[in-house]
Amino acid sequence: KAVDMKPSVREKMILQSKCSIRDGYYDASAAYIRKAVDDILARLHTDYLDILLLHRPDALMDPGETAEALERLHEQGKVRYFGVSNYSVMQMELLQKYMKQPLFVNQLQISLAHTPLIDEGMAVNMDIDQSVLRTGGLLPYCQFKEINVQAWSPYQKGFFGGSFIGDLEEYGELNSLIDTLASKY
């Protein structure tokens, strides 16, 4: 138990958690989401989460059922805001079609050394690999819909590349700048 969850302490925190990923498969069913949230709240010794993310898209989910479960959790005061992780534009549109409140966040892989989301917007109409629209315009879509982009693995070079922190051979200048800023602030 890391924190005493007195109301005065809890009010100063933003608690976020994820659900819909299990051993072997993804599960965005209403029953799984409800149980997952109850379990999370019990483990954290709190009455509510500020943000709940659906962790990875469940391609076989019933979006109406999933949205209804999320709305019920909101009505019960168990979750204030909802988001997703690694959802495409159309996956968010499909879920949002059935939700009353807007999605608050999409947690995506992005870092100083992993920038495909940014690159595809800067390479429009250019004959280079980065101009291929792999995400369907995910970053500008999130901006347009006012969905916050939250980084996962913000210190990674890519999914398998490891961290750029301490990699002086490939990212020496970046590490030097980070060290300078860290000592300053």
Predicted regions and their residues:
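A short, structured active-site edge motif that brings together acidic residues
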Residues: 10-23, 107-112
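Short, acidic/polar
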Residues: 26-45, 65, 89-94, 134
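Beta/alpha (TIM)-barrel catalytic core signal, keyed to glycine-rich beta->alpha loops juxtaposed to Asp/Glu
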Residues: 57, 61-185
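Active-site mouth loops of central-metabolism enzymes
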Residues: 19-34, 55, 60-61, 127
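Short acidic capping loops at alpha-helix termini that bridge into adjacent secondary structure
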Residues: 9-13, 47-51, 80-81, 102-105
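Active-site groove signature of glycoside hydrolases
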Residues: 41-62
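N-terminal binding-site loop/beta-alpha segment at the start of enzyme catalytic domains
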Residues: 1-14, 75, 157-158
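Active-site phosphate/pyrophosphate- and oxyanion-stabilizing loops and adjacent acidic/basic residues
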Residues: 3-4, 38, 93, 179
